[in-house]
Regions:
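A polyampholytic, Gly/Pro-enriched intrinsically disordered region
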Residues: 2, 48-56, 113-124
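Flexible, glycine/proline-enriched loop segments at strand-loop-helix junctions
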Residues: 3-6, 95-99, 129-134
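Glycine-rich, anion-gripping cofactor-binding loops and their flanking helix/strand elements
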Residues: 6-97
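Generic recognition of stable, solvent-exposed alpha-helical segments in well-folded globular domains
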Residues: 12-16, 55-58, 103-106, 110, ...
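Generic secondary-structure signature for well-ordered alpha-helical cores
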Residues: 22-26, 65-68, 113-120, 147-148
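Gly-rich Lys/Arg/Thr-decorated short loops/hinges at beta-loop-alpha junctions or inter-strand turns
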Residues: 39, 88-91, 115-130
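Ser/Thr/Gly-rich flexible loops in soluble cytosolic domains mediating phosphotransfer, phosphorylation
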Residues: 93-114
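Active-site diphosphate/adenylate-binding microenvironment
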Residues: 123-148
Length: 148
């Protein structure tokens, strides 16, 4: 799994990470408290590591290699009663490709080149607009009109 944070969550690096994920079959997530994530139609979609400890542990339970790009090893907040502090399983190897202060786009470009996936097409979000509705004005019909 690729775990992204910081400037790795901008459009360009996120697209490169998407190429790596598609080309290798790896999954990817973002750190929980990301300051900024570029999202929307035409961009690579990424989900965050969940905040609740049990959900985060469930997401990470089968991860054997966690590659950090612009973030640190995921941990639970301090001293949560009867919950693990480390969210990764004991047999998970954590690899730091690039730390938060490193050149994240260059690190991802290098990895994509090494893996031979520079030209692999990433999965991009498609634009989804609601259908126009007719009839009485309701909160749903107004929302649909605004969303269209």
């Amino acid at each position: 799994m690729l775990l992204l944070g910081g400037k790795a969550l901008r459009a360009g690096p996120l697209e490169t990470a998407g190429r790596i994920a598609v080309g290798t079959g790896a999954s990817m997530r973002s750190e929980l408290m990301a300051a900024r994530t570029e999202r929307g139609a035409g961009r690579v979609s990424i989900e965050r590591i969940p905040y609740p400890v049990d959900q985060a542990v469930e997401i990470l339970k089968d991860v054997r290699h966690l590659i950090l790009v612009g973030t640190v090893k995921p941990v639970a907040f301090f001293a949560y009663p009867d919950k693990p502090s480390l969210l990764t399983p004991p047999d998970c190897e954590v690899h730091t490709l690039a730390g938060p202060a490193d050149d994240l786009p260059a690190a991802l470009d290098w990895l994509a080149e090494e893996l031979g996936v520079r030209t692999t097409a990433p999965e991009l979000q498609v634009s989804q607009r609601p259908d126009l509705v007719s009839g009485a004005l309701t909160t749903e019909s107004i929302g649909s009109a605004v969303g269209h």
